[in-house]
Design a protein with these regions (language model features):
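Helix-loop boundary and gating motifs at the non-cytosolic
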Residues: 6-61, 214-258
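Transmembrane alpha-helix termini and helix-breaking/packing motifs in multi-pass membrane transporters
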Residues: 43, 154-172, 360-377
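Helix-to-loop junctions at the C-terminal end of transmembrane segments
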Residues: 65-78, 163, 264-281
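Structural signature of the two symmetry-related core transmembrane helices
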Residues: 81-95, 179, 281-297
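Cytoplasmic helix-loop-helix junction between adjacent transmembrane helices
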Residues: 109-148
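C-terminal membrane-cytosol helix-exit motif in multi-pass small-molecule transporters
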Residues: 160, 180-198, 390-394
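C-terminal transmembrane helical hairpin of 12-TM major facilitator-type secondary transporters
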Residues: 280-326
Length: 401
């Protein structure tokens, strides 16, 4: 069993192994911050939950705004160097947040962090795009995602200690540890081999990506699909508490199931994404699975605690299948559909789909699943079926490679 788990998070490829090690350090720290950050700044510092949420929204908007320029930089300069610098600056910025007392300073620092993070993420995606071709690149992304889930899950568990102690010092310790994790990740990233930029430094910024309508529409459709991540993080917790008789702790149980499934099966399922044509079919299949899970979630309303818990568990199991398959398909489409010399900017565009979904998704989901209940889940199911079919139609002329 242990050997199986290790095989799903430790790549046989030494380059991917070094990438994932740095990623684990980084996401371990992120898990700590995401658990205590909003609580610390909202209630310990006293900025208020709404104002803190607004600051995160502004930061996300900054990240979206620099996606394309950050991609241009990733194509023209060393992805390794950009990755190292981004980790260092994020660590310093996060460390400064411990001393924040006002909303304006907090927001400025958060925007700076999001700004730097976008450059680092685009550089890392550009690097992975050069690891290999086709299925090998998808497998590398799968290892990264499995380790991400393991890191965030582990960091969340450690942050639980701070929540239990519930003192300013405990919360500050978690934030400082996250800041240090960025610096350690930068150190680990120095062991990653250099890869050459795909473009020359003197080449002008090419905005033709914005005219690549096929890629832009695929990005938008994938952004619509990524709404399912917010179903897990926002819709399900609110739905369970407000509309079902399942115990609140069951939310943690099904989320733990999701985390462990990604760690154990993301790499295995990635081996099925052989080429772009296969990925297009898998994207539609994944969308269907998520649609079915929405219908199952909706059925948990109005039944006793045992049945509600069982129904939610079944819904999450189907949802996990859609998430695993859909993630692999999304990575293949994102990288193989792109101009291979401009992976940085193309992956920057692709990330904008996620960003827009994160910005508008929470309000939409709450309005649907709480505002109109089971009908809202039905609408979501129809949405995912439509997204999958539209992607299939949009890319139907692509031949297998």
């Amino acid at each position: 069993m242990l050997k199986s788990i290790v095989g799903n998070i430790v790549s046989p490829d030494p380059t991917v192994r070094k990438l994932t090690f740095a990623n684990f350090i980084n996401t371990f720290g992120n898990g700590m911050f995401h658990t205590v950050g909003i609580i610390y700044f909202s209630f310990i510092v006293g900025l208020g939950a709404q104002k803190v949420a607004l600051a995160f929204t502004i930061g996300a908007a900054v990240s979206l705004a620099v996606s394309v320029p950050a991609g241009h930089i990733a194509d023209r300069y060393s992805p390794k160097t950009i990755g190292i610098l981004s980790f260092i600056f994020q660590g310093l910025i996060l460390g400064a947040q411990v001393f924040t007392k006002t909303w304006h300073i907090f927001t400025i620092l958060l925007c700076l962090e999001y700004f730097v993070e976008r450059f680092g993420q685009n550089a890392r995606m550009s690097y992975i795009a050069q690891v290999g071709e086709g299925q090998k690149r998808v497998e590398a992304r799968a290892y990264m995602r499995a380790v991400t889930n393991l890191g965030i899950g582990s960091g969340t568990l450690i942050a639980g200690i701070a929540l239990a102690i519930n003192t300013p010092t405990a919360y500050k310790t978690m934030i400082v540890m996250d800041a240090l994790s960025f610096l350690l990740a930068a150190l680990a990233y120095t062991r990653v081999p250099n890869v050459a930029p795909t473009l020359e430094k003197h080449e002008k910024f090419d905005w033709s990506v914005l005219k690549d309508h096929r890629y832009i529409l695929a990005t938008a459709l994938n952004g619509g699909f990524t709404l399912h991540f917010l179903i897990q993080n926002i819709a399900i917790p609110v739905w369970v508490v407000k509309e079902t008789n399942a115990p609140r702790w069951w939310i943690s149980a099904i989320m733990l199931l999701n985390t462990m499934a990604i760690v154990l099966f993301q790499v295995r399922t990635s081996k099925r994404s052989k080429n772009l044509q296969t990925a297009i079919k898998q994207f539609q299949q994944a969308s269907f699975y998520v649609a079915v899970s929405c219908l199952i979630y909706g059925a948990s309303h109005g039944v006793n605690a045992v049945f509600a818990s069982a129904i939610l568990l079944a819904g999450m199991a189907i949802h996990i299948a859609g998430e695993l398959i859909g993630s692999n398909a999304s990575w293949m489409i994102a990288m193989d559909l792109a101009d291979q010399r401009r992976q940085g900017v193309y992956q920057g565009i692709w990330s904008m789909g996620f960003g827009l979904s994160d910005m508008v998704g929470p309000s939409i989901l709450v309005a649907l699943v709480i505002g109109i209940g089971q009908l809202g889940w039905l609408i979501l199911a129809a949405w995912f079926v439509l997204i999958g079919q539209l992607m299939r139609w949009h890319l139907r002329k692509i031949k297998s490679v």
